[in-house]
Structures are given as C-alpha cells and as structure tokens.
C-alpha cells in the first residue's frame, strides 16, 4: 500500500467530516466489529479479546478497545482545520506505537475499506470524498511513521 500524498482539505470537507462524526462517534463498538468481521485476520491482533469475535463484541474489553479508537479519531477530527500540528503529533504517535506492534499499511488500509463501506451503509456516502481526504491525511502521517520517517 502506497503512502498517500498529503491532501489539502477544504473548509467544506472539514465541516462535512465533523458533522458526520458527531452522528457516528457513539458507534465505536459497531465500527470495530464491522472492521474485524470484514477482515477477521486482524482479530488475533487484539489478544485480550479472546478467540470468538461474536462473543467478544458484548464484553467490556471490546467496548474499551472501541472507545480507544473513537477517542483517537475524536482527537484527530476535532483538530482538522485548526491544529494540524496537534493532529500530526497524535498520528505520528499512533504510527510509531503500531509499528512496534507489527501493524502494517495493509491492515490500516483494511480499516479504511471497512470504514468507507460502513459510512456508506449508514447513509454518509455523500461525504465519502471528504472522508477519503481525511483518511489520506491520517495515513500520510501514520504511514511515514510506520516507515520510520515521521512528518
């Protein structure tokens, strides 16, 4: 998976993503479950969740992991359009920590595929261009960190 170029996001794109985010940020368990169900090869990376995805979904550990993902995305999305330095710091930190865990660009790309599909399923397909720009921005920074060259 190639590292995407750093996009320039318009104010309208930022507003669209932030508006959608307000409507879906409470869906962390569903987002994580959709990703892991679509790409089950990633489930073993979440060792504390056990061996059965369906059984794990209702556990406190699953909700805790989903909440961590949502909190991270919240931190980045709230900085869009106003604090790129802060967003990059969060993204570099995530890339560095996930490199240490052996997470690959392919696995991040699988998360993108699942998120894009889920956004469409939830009725947010009209803003998919804005979401793609947001994910390109995130992956530009994360992938550089995975490559050992944080930006």
UniProtKB/Swiss-Prot annotation:
**Pfam families, sorted:** Globin (PF00042)
Key words of the record: Heme, Iron, Metal-binding, Oxygen transport, Transport
GO molecular function annotations of the record: heme binding; metal ion binding; oxygen binding; oxygen carrier activity
- List residues binding heme b: 98
Q: Where is the Globin domain?
A: 8-147
This protein's GO cellular component annotations are:
extracellular region; hemoglobin complex
Superkingdom classification of source:
Eukaryota
Assembly and interactions? Monomer.
Q: Which family does it belong to?
A: Belongs to the globin family.
Q: What else is known?
A: There are at least 12 different components in Midge globin.
**Mind telling me what this protein is named?**
Globin CTT-IIIA
Q: What is the lineage of its organism?
A: Eukaryota, Metazoa, Ecdysozoa, Arthropoda, Hexapoda
